A protein has these predicted regions:
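Bacterial N-terminal signal peptides
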Residues: 13-25
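Phosphate-group recognition and catalysis centered on beta-loop-alpha active-site segments
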Residues: 2, 28-354
Length: 354
């Protein structure tokens, strides 16, 4: 009994030390490595999204992968825009020569009004300049408005190769096919130009640093039939794939749904809320890993409006919350990759404490 009382303080101090060491340890995915840092539309928290400036900044900040969303021009060229409607991310509305191009289209069942990449040749798009999408939240980015053109996918691949030569490290690319059924329906499918460019720049096998992602199912299955490049099935918290009426993303995240995804894809891309609920991890990461799928979550942003309540800081003068704390919490679920508008800060959040 006396020995037990004597040992209690030692045991207590040892437990505290172990807890401190665990908290200081780097966050690791189940693979034993830190989660990949995927620059969401480039370093889009600091530069207008989907510009060469945003991608280069992300690479310079140490991102493992950069993510270009891909749409097509009228002459079949892949360019980087989050949507094919470009009124909110370019100066097209200030070009009177294109005023008559404004139109209303039905895309994935939704009516959208604006200017669309498929109505412009690449040469015409070259006359436009990018603008900050989230100007109210990121006013500092607006100083870069009208400086950068819309890049082609090939220009992005050339940038990656140039930065690899400069830095001596491999830099991954993570393209998303945007609205593939819609584009195929108007005679502008993604698959052939996408695979041709990737092959031209040396991306041909599952060992190469590339993931192709989509919210749809059919184009991923078609890609799997002709390529071994790694594929990611994107999912959302609501709705379902535009090309699979009657199927919901919730259905796809059941054990059976994950098994079906594993037949054609190498991983899933859910929103962060699907892996980390307010009460704790949801178990989705474990279920996905059990069927051999990687998990790459989107999107970590610094602003309070994008963070769960527990990680918000309402009094912050820049409107930013506890981004580092949230990044660590998400990484702690065992995810294999994390999309972020702020790749440098995401990387720093996962570094071990000194």
């Amino acid at each position: 009994m006396i020995l037990g009382r004597m040992l209690r303080p030692v045991i207590h101090r040892t437990a505290i030390l172990l807890l401190t060491l665990l908290m200081a340890a780097p966050v690791m995915a189940e693979t034993g490595a830190e989660p990949l840092i995927i620059a969401h539309r480039g370093a889009s928290g600091e530069r207008p999204e989907h510009t060469l400036a945003a991608y280069e900044r992300a690479i310079d900040q140490g991102a493992d992968y950069i993510e270009p969303d891909l749409v097509l021009t009228r002459d079949g060229v892949l360019v980087a825009r989050h949507e094919n409607e470009i009124g909110g991310t370019t100066d097209v509305a200030d070009h009177p020569e294109f005023a008559a191009r404004k139109a209303t289209r039905t895309i994935d069942g939704q009516q959208v009004t604006g200017w669309f990449t498929e109505d412009f040749t690449l040469a015409e798009l070259r006359t436009l300049r990018a603008r900050e999408r989230l100007a109210a939240l990121r006013p500092a980015n607006s100083r870069f408005n009208d400086l950068y053109p819309i890049p082609t996918f090939e220009e992005i691949l050339k940038l990656v190769r140039a930065k690899e030569a400069e830095t001596g490290r491999r830099i991954g690319v993570y393209p998303e096919t945007k609205h593939p059924s819609y584009f195929a329906g108007i005679g502008l499918p993604h698959q052939a130009p996408l695979l041709a460019l990737l092959s031209q720049y040396g991306y041909q096998t599952e060992a190469d640093p590339v993931f192709i992602q989509s919210f749809e199912v059919g184009n991923l299955k078609a890609l799997r039939a002709v390529t071994r490049l790694r594929l990611i099935q994107l999912v959302d918290g609501e709705g379902g794939p535009a090309d699979a009426p009657g199927t919901t993303y919730a259905d796809m995240m059941t054990t059976r749904g994950l098994e079906q995804i594993a037949d054609y894809a190498d991983g899933i891309g859910p929103p962060t809320a699907m892996v980390l609920a307010p009460e704790g991890p949801t178990g989705l990461v474990d279920r996905a890993h059990q069927v051999g799928l990687q998990v790459h979550v989107w999107t970590l942003r610094m602003e309070n409006s994008f963070l769960p309540t527990a990680f918000q800081r309402p009094d912050d003068p820049q409107g930013r919350g506890d981004f580092a704390g949230y990044a660590r919490a998400v990484a702690g679920t065992g995810v294999d990759g994390m999309f972020s508008d702020f790749p440098r800060q995401a990387r720093e959040a996962l570094k071990p404490a000194l």
